UniProtKB/Swiss-Prot annotation:
It comes from Methanocaldococcus jannaschii (strain ATCC 43067 / DSM 2661 / JAL-1 / JCM 10045 / NBRC 100440). InterPro entries: Znf/thioredoxin_put. NCBIfam families: MJ0042_CXXC. This is Uncharacterized protein MJ0042.
Length: 215
């Protein structure tokens, strides 16, 4: 890149160096003035900084026909079926989100979130459960981590800890591994369609499990 000396006006060609820090010192070959140049953010560092911040903006929440998300889920047990459009770090996603009646046969499952993962190139699903205190959580399985074969895996403990820290959620041990608690209680009233903050948290969890390059 080229920079202009503030003293003599000479143009200086600067070779970028990966020497750490956000600035580097160069000397004007004409007058000897020291100039501090702010280094441009490299793509690798840009991606790293982007992953430290997950911005979710809900654009639309639309109630749809109460069809079942799974073959073994009764349609009459679907309390709400939503289509949600969201802007996530500048990318538009469309989610299908179901609220399921709390029943023993569903083993605590109360929410189902589906969307197309850009990383996996296919539709991916995340189920959310409640514990005996009606606290909403998501299990350690299934998900994906960056750079691995695109198949369902149980996320490593380190990745779960990273997600919990970045999203501000609590991590606890459960009977099937780690649980990521959203800090929300399950309730049928108000319904999910009237709880945009909960919808945002459900989406953030889905992103964390299925779009590893975003967080």
């Amino acid at each position: 890149m080229n920079v202009k000396c503030p003293e003599c006006g000479a143009w200086i060609y600067v070779v970028e160096e990966d020497s750490g820090g956000d600035a580097m010192e160069v000397k004007c070959p004409k007058c000897g003035t020291s100039i501090y140049v702010v280094k441009p953010m490299g793509e690798k560092m840009k991606n790293k900084r982007d992953k430290d911040f997950l911005d979710v903006k809900i654009l639309e929440i639309e109630e749809t026909k109460k069809t079942s998300p799974y073959k073994d889920t009764k349609s009459e047990d679907v309390l709400k079926a939503l289509r949600v459009k969201a802007n996530i770090n500048g990318e538009i996603y469309e989610f299908r989100i179901w609220q399921i009646a709390k029943k023993p046969e569903y083993r605590g499952m109360v929410y189902v979130v589906k969307s197309v993962s850009h990383y996996c190139g296919s539709v991916k699903t995340k189920n959310f459960q409640v514990d005996e205190d009606n606290d909403i959580y998501v299990k350690q399985k299934f998900g994906i981590i960056e750079g691995v074969n695109k198949s369902k895996i149980k996320l490593p403990k380190e990745r779960m800890e990273e997600i919990a820290e970045k999203l501000g959620f609590e991590l606890k041990e459960g009977d099937e591994g780690l649980r990521l608690y959203l800090g929300e209680k399950y309730s049928e009233n108000p319904p999910l369609s009237q709880r945009p903050e909960l919808i945002e948290k459900l989406i953030k969890c889905w992103i964390a499990f299925w779009e590893p390059t975003m967080i």
